[in-house]
Amino acid sequence: MTFALGQRWISDTESDLGLGTVVAMDARTVTVMFAASEENRVYARTDAPVTRVAFNVGDVIECQEGWSLSVEEVIEDKGLLTYLGTREDTQETEVTLREIFLSNQIRFNKPQDKLYAGQIDRMDNFVLRYRALSNQYQQHKSPMRGLCGMRAGLIPHQLYIAHEVGRRHAPRVLLADEVGLGKTIEAGMIIHQQVLSGRAERILIVVPETLQHQWLVEMMRRFNLHFSIFDEERCIESFAESDNPFDTQQYVLCSLDFLRKSRKRYEQALEGEWDLLVVDEAHHLEWSQDKPSREYQVVEGLAENTSGVLLLTATPEQLGRESHFARLRLLDPDRFYDYEAFVEEEDQYAPVADAVTALFSGVKLENSAKNQITELLSEQDVEPLFRVIEGDSSEEEQALARQELIDNLMDRHGTGRVLFRNTRAAIKGFPKRNVNLLPMDIPTQYTTSMRVSGMIGGKMAPEARAMKMLYPEEIFQEFEGEDSSWWQFDSRVNWLIEKIQDKRSEKILVIASRASTALQLEQALREREGVRATVFHEGMSILERDKAAAYFAQEEGGAQVLICSEIGSEGRNFQFANQLVMFDLPFNPDLLEQRIGRLDRIGQLRDIDIHVPYLKGTSQAILARWFDEGLNAFAETCPTGRTVYDKYSDVLIEMLASGNTEQLDEVIEESAKLNQSLKSDLEKGRDRLLEMHSNGGDKAHEIAEKIASTDGDTNLVTFALSLFDTIGLNQDDKGENALVVTPSEHMMVPSYPGLPYEGATITFDRETALSREDMNFISWEHPMIQGGIDLLLSEGVGASAVSLLKNKALPVGTILLELVYLVDAQAPKRSGISQFLPKTPIRLMMDGRGNDLSAQVEFDSFNRQLSPVNRHLASKLVNSVQGEIHKLIEAGETHVLPKVEEVRQQAQKDMQTNLNGELERLQALKAVNPNIRDEELEVIEAQINELTGYISKAQVQLDSLRLIVVSHN
């Protein structure tokens, strides 16, 4: 390296220092001053990590005074360069600029500048960058975007609803699936799609207080969406940042009670400018024409101010038509304006459902059914289809004609677009429940303490006393103190220990009402028999619960028993277990259903054993009999349970409080009758049409298969591991399909997006991720991959590289130049541009004569023939052919333009086909189905105009390049 005072050099290792000037030299060292960053560096002369900055004819360079010069000649004198050329601002010719006056801020952002300045990256980084661009492009174009990356089983009806609703602009729908069919997951998938496509940036979820935790966990665990729970305390804290606390976070979760109680907070939430509002347990919003409840008004206000609304409810409309209408009214007040009109319209659907049932079953259509169909659809539409169905066409044609009729009827179906409801009856794949009710003798210690408690109990409200009598172990502790070892003599504990020993190879889930009972049971199992058990209760943090759940899920060396309290178990699913023990019973049927729902979910592969040990002659015995004989709530799901409970709760509470069972048989008999009649009403009113529409039929299975085929993508695994390597993360293989990824000291950036400070355990396998909640499920949509790709591209990793091609068929020294361009339409994310024209890479492979060989030379197979070059040699190679590289880049510019035009035209065509198709369908439907909102049509028209503008203005720029030189050795 020859240095001279006044020369300009750039640091290879600290490119952000700017342009440096040689200010001092001695025999062994050289001092370079970087004026832009006010830093000096002293290097050894022999191998200083710096590169000489020399510009060529054709470059545009900037002077310290701010003007630019287009270089026409370069003169070297005693190691210093002087540039001659034309000033860009005044057009003055033959202006000279000595290199000492070059701007200190010059950064080499363009890939060719980096190449000339010797900032040459490793070859594998260039490959990684190209793969990042290609994969990012494919992900954006995929119609399944937003559905592949969530940690959930691929269940067809859920995927269908999410796919159907998630792609709409500002969806307003009611998700009314029965318990255990996964409404929360459906809502999460819709939110996830809306977030990824940029349609929803601000989201508010309103849920009952007891479910806040569950939603927080589900959104974070399954979809990597980090919500913040807002309560009064949080709002006061946020006041420092903003007048409206709701503006401090994009994703907010709060309880309905919190908004109902505080008018101020409710008004602030109204001003929050949300894109999407999600309300869980919407059946609690009571409404009547003259007197809507305060809760209902709160949600109504929010729904009026928010463009997208998802309401979730488990209560079927047959159990309350008025409240069902009220929920639909929240979604579209213009359409559902009058309850009487709604009832009348609903009654007209009964014949539609009959007609569809007839079509589905494939029986010959009666004339009456045909007339009904003709009344609903116009005659010229249906006549040819009837002819096909009744003629002697092939079975396939008949099936298609039936399907077309069904689709047309579906589209006309009043609430088809706003309401989705799946029932267990319509969806296969649920386990059978084996129920074991186990009456046990009551220990004398309990009888004594309960008797004494009854005598000194004084005036307690019946409800409080009923609650108390359900838990004899707590009454005993009141007299004997907290430390009393009730579990030494409780017959249920003795039975439980035997059961655990009997089922050594099975995982057992035990649920008790109170956290204290759960903790004491764990102690009992540990101290009496050394059983490996773990506890789960509301006093634990999310992380502690995760660890407990993971310990329970572990195949080898994990806990055999997990003991949960009532609240602690909310929202957690343990499908891998099939033994459920109810140590005591909850007060109402909803909670009972929730307990069984921890195991009895879609995706459970085995039948479930439900064990209910209870003490004879106690309140528990009364409750066990009523649940079993009155509701049959242990053996099957009980959507009617709540209604029956509301009717008989007073009598039940009285019985539980006093222990008097005279009326029990009568109450059980009446409950069973009422339950039966409600269930048959439900069955009669089952809206087959709605069910068919909600479960998506074959289409749903296609979506599930499509996503399943992308699981286990080896391309993703290879890419992720190279990405983590390049950015500098440590990776340790942990077995069981898992890796541990931790930050290292040599990272490219101080913190890696999506990775906690202490690292994370990751898996690429969906099944593993489902059984182990402590692992991150890595997919193309995971923040660690998305964030990593963004980091790669923004930090300029792999923008320029040099490789050798050992090929005796070509003369030594032949050069090839690989150019990767990026077509980018500068448009806001919410415009939906990424679906039609995401950032699109175009690869060219220029030979020495300026021809493009990319069509003949495929990237991967060519890349395997190349070998890397060290930086020093790479710089020399670049300097020796710099002039030729210039010419090839110019040739590349002309080759790429027609390709950019093709990309634009294809994007425009895709967009027109997609959006015009949707627009025409909605316009045709609007004529017959009042459920289509005008606003939806206007939005699509505006979107077409807006996108046409963005696509036509899409720009292209050179993103990265690689010089390839042929050698023979």
Swiss-Prot record:
Motif (DEAH box): 280-283
Keywords from the named record: Activator, ATP-binding, DNA-binding, Helicase, Hydrolase, Nucleotide-binding, Transcription, Transcription regulation
Gene designation: rapA
SUBUNIT field: Interacts with the RNAP. Has a higher affinity for the core RNAP than for the holoenzyme. Its ATPase activity is stimulated by binding to RNAP.
Family according to the record: Belongs to the SNF2/RAD54 helicase family. RapA subfamily.
InterPro entries per the UniProt record, alphabetical: Helicase_ATP-bd, Helicase_C-like, Helicase_RapA, P-loop_NTPase, RapA_C, SNF2-like_sf, SNF2/RAD54-like_C, SNF2_N
Keyword Hydrolase part of the UniProt annotation: yes
Domain annotation Helicase ATP-binding: ranges: 164-334
HAMAP family: Helicase_RapA
Helicase C-terminal domain location: 492-679
Protein name: RNA polymerase-associated protein RapA
BP GO annotations: regulation of DNA-templated transcription
Keyword Repeat included in the entry's annotation: no
GO MF: ATP binding; DNA binding; helicase activity; hydrolase activity, acting on acid anhydrides
Residues that bind ATP: 177-184
EC number(s) reported in the record: 3.6.4.-
Described purpose of this protein according to its UniProt entry: Transcription regulator that activates transcription by stimulating RNA polymerase (RNAP) recycling in case of stress conditions such as supercoiled DNA or high salt concentrations. Probably acts by releasing the RNAP, when it is trapped or immobilized on tightly supercoiled DNA. Does not activate transcription on linear DNA. Probably not involved in DNA repair.
